[in-house]
């Protein structure tokens, strides 16, 4: 804990509040994964749990899933300490071309395999932590140490100030076209093209491609057999591949984070200080953002759009303050709620309508089921 608080990015520690308290308890309890969490051996043998036995109303929980289906979800999986508490799948009617672009196939149970869009960023954040743990990088290294000069459209001097930490925190100071916008660390801007350079660094230091390193470091240990990086022929080269997976396999990833970086008895990522930093405010410009993860319970948040619009209050007001999330286009979601022992995954088409986004529609319904 002392090591974590000493990190320079946590000079804003007063804003962390319940998120840090819950996650610190979760991540420091190394016995939690061994004693309290269940890890499925395979999809064929994934235990379920009766919601009523762990404080949830079955009828109201079903109503929350009904709502998710009405909001164009293709799949929702809710885990309680690793066991499936609720799960449902839908066949989308008249899916948009955009959804069809993200649909990569189906598993043997006919469950959708989908490119999770920007939810992949949170997977890359974990890969960066593993690379640092293995001594391949330091997130405080300059990007140019690994990619040389000229990787952006900023001047050499401006570019030299940008670190991997800046890319993980979305405060590189680069505009979406990779030109200089502000000094590194001086402004927060959700910048997908800049983020993609994190993976380029990881491929460089690992000496292999993204599929191989992701398989070795994450998906193979977790049994995520349908998960891989897939090409996006419809996209610009800067975002030309996406992480594709199923709702169940994304839930496996969330369960590993819930277990503090462990899967069964295997340490996937052992650096608890990095995990705590990843799931806590990475800077003061947008306290609702960690290292490529979204964080609830903060004073305000900045949006992912080009204008980075400020919204006062929690990211998801109806959800517990300690929620952290992976979020992507078409409302791809993974929510982790330490205080409720939940991992919640949602895939599908855009679930936001009538000026109400999916988060603000789904979470009041889900929390109504809590007894």
Residue ranges and their predicted role:
Residues 29-30:
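N-terminal signal peptide c-region/cleavage motif recognized by signal peptidases
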Residues 66-104, 334-336, 341-345:
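A short, well-structured edge-of-sheet supersecondary motif
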Residues 82, 101-103, 110-139, 198-203, ...:
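Active-site SXXK
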Residues 93-109, 353-361:
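A short, polar/charged loop-to-alpha-helix boundary motif
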Residues 110, 115-118, 133-174, 206-245:
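Active-site helix/loop module of the DD-peptidase/beta-lactamase fold
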Residues 194-201, 242-263, 332-347:
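Active-site-proximal alpha-helical segments within enzyme catalytic domains
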Residues 226, 280-343:
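Active-site Gly/Thr loop motif
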Residues 323-371:
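Structured C-terminal helix/loop/strand segments within mature extracytoplasmic catalytic/sensor domains
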